[in-house]
Amino acid sequence: MYVGRFLLAGKLEDGTPIAVYGVCSRSFSDRRIEVREGAAFVVPEDPSYITENPYVTYTCARIVDEFLVLTNGAQTDPIADKLESGVPPREALVSVTFAMDYEHDEYNTPRISLITDGETFWLGRVAPEEVYFRVMKPKDGEGYLLSVYGEYAEVPSKPNMTLDREDPLECDPVPSFEHYVCSVIARHDGGRWSLEAR
């Protein structure tokens, strides 16, 4: 199944909060994630794409104090900046994602955004014909999956996957995602978020 970009968030069975941003792509498969200084970036292997296509390279994750921000595009930094200025998470997520609208590229790509402090997960999606936001508090082993395209392209109203593996990329249905390119995995341990590029 092809999902484009995806967000996965919830708690492992041992209670560890986890979140993932993943890239699946048919058009630009030569990309990777770089992690540096509390942030993660989607970057192309070929630097010439940076100037040719602004949707290929972007900040996909930022840690702001106790909060983690994950998104599929240019909304990451404005959301994080609002959190840094003291704006509550719900307002930061909704105001920025809604204001920036879907990506006005040739595909009208929806924007998907997440903020979490490890206990509460604020998740949203803005598409040409859809604006939807939800607040979730998963129990141990529960996960929420939201993708740009395909079967998981709606903000879930209840957990729609089980986080029954230590590696969330091994949890069903993620291994079935076609054209997987790269991802960043965020884990909340000891009161802090850490980022791992995959």
From Swiss-Prot:
UniProt catalytic activity: IMP + H2O = 5-formamido-1-(5-phospho-D-ribosyl)imidazole-4-carboxamide
Protein's UniProt keywords contain Hydrolase: yes
Disulfide bonds, paired cysteine numbers: none
Entry-linked SUPFAM superfamilies: Archaeal IMP cyclohydrolase PurO
UniProt KW keywords: Hydrolase, Purine biosynthesis
EC number: 3.5.4.10
Pathway: Purine metabolism; IMP biosynthesis via de novo pathway; IMP from 5-formamido-1-(5-phospho-D-ribosyl)imidazole-4-carboxamide: step 1/1
Keyword Hydrolase: yes
Gene Ontology terms: biological process: 'de novo' IMP biosynthetic process
MF term (GO), any: IMP cyclohydrolase activity
Pfam families named among the record's database cross-references: IMP_cyclohyd (PF07826)
Role noted for this protein: Catalyzes the cyclization of 5-formylamidoimidazole-4-carboxamide ribonucleotide to IMP.
Family of this protein: Belongs to the archaeal IMP cyclohydrolase family.
Protein name (record): IMP cyclohydrolase
